[in-house]
Amino acid sequence: MSSVEPDMEDLFQEKKRVRNPLVPLGALMTAGVLTAGLISFRRGNSQLGQVLMRARVVVQGATVALMVGTGYYYGDNPWKKLLLSEIHETEALSPKSSSAATLTLMNQKDPSSSSIVSVLCLVISGLALIIVFLGVLYLIFKFLRKSSTLFPIPHFNYNPDLFSFSSPQLQHLFFLHDSGLDQTAIDALPVFLYGNVTISLEQPFDCAVCLNEFSDTDKLRLLPVCSHAFHLHCIDTWLLSNSTCPLCRRSLSTSNVCYNHSETLVAPLSGHQQVDDGKASLAKRVFSVRLGRFKSTNESQSQRHDVKDEIGVRMPRRCYSMGTQQYLVCDQDFVVALSSSPREGNIGR
């Protein structure tokens, strides 16, 4: 038997050296797609991660199918097992007769059509790999095309006339994905000192962004489109990633925020002070400011709608719900004037 087995190894020497290349190739492709999907999920791109996970399942299934389909060509030769079983039955034969019997059985059992089957397996394997590759490319292209429709351009031209000003919440829903305003547009918004506008009031108002009270030395930035004002650093940080008012969600476009002023400060005007129609009207531009404060939602309805509150002004004009608190906007407007020249940045009356 010892002389028979070397002969068998010589007969199947070429088959023994052949290894299935689809096993490492499929494993490498599956691992690569899986790694890319995990990286996408970690970076917050869930849509691309889902596409890559689906592609991983397709690649893994195709790899298993190819391994099963090419098992005849790359796997163990069934004729070898059959010959070994028949050789064991003829152990009484001499080595020479065993070798002759082996050659006879090989000529009988191994048909010439095996080469055709091998070629067909290779062709099918190549076509399957091409189909898998094209499928992955199609999924990636479909995702990129969907992303381009959802996020066409980071900076879009917004026309405020297309939407009603009475529905700022609806405007915000249509423009959920924006990249905020440029720093130059933010700097063009007017700035004023809180203490100069509310000099006669005792109880301070609150900032709707940081939820803290205003102090007399705080600088506030005004949004002229809605007349709401916030802390300078609070609203600047907000507008870098959002192009809407944080309180009423009204959209801010380049046309209604740029005034060609740099580092401007607003000079306060009392409610009874009139702006002259001559030279003064050309030098300053009057704006109204709406401020408010937070009230707990646990308070009764009558307490929130008193005719006069602690500071002696009518509250509220409008109420904005913020979790367990409500932001009540004062019914009284504070009038301020914007200097038309950047050099007139000092506060004055």
Swiss-Prot record:
Annotated metabolic or biological route of this protein: Protein modification; protein ubiquitination
Membrane topology per record: Multi-pass membrane protein
TM region positions: 21-41, 55-75, 121-141
Gene expressing this chain: ATL48
UniProt name for this protein: RING-H2 finger protein ATL48
Modified residues (N-acetylserine): S2
Subcellular location: Membrane
EC number: 2.3.2.27
An example Gene Ontology biological process: protein ubiquitination
The keyword Heme is assigned to this record: no
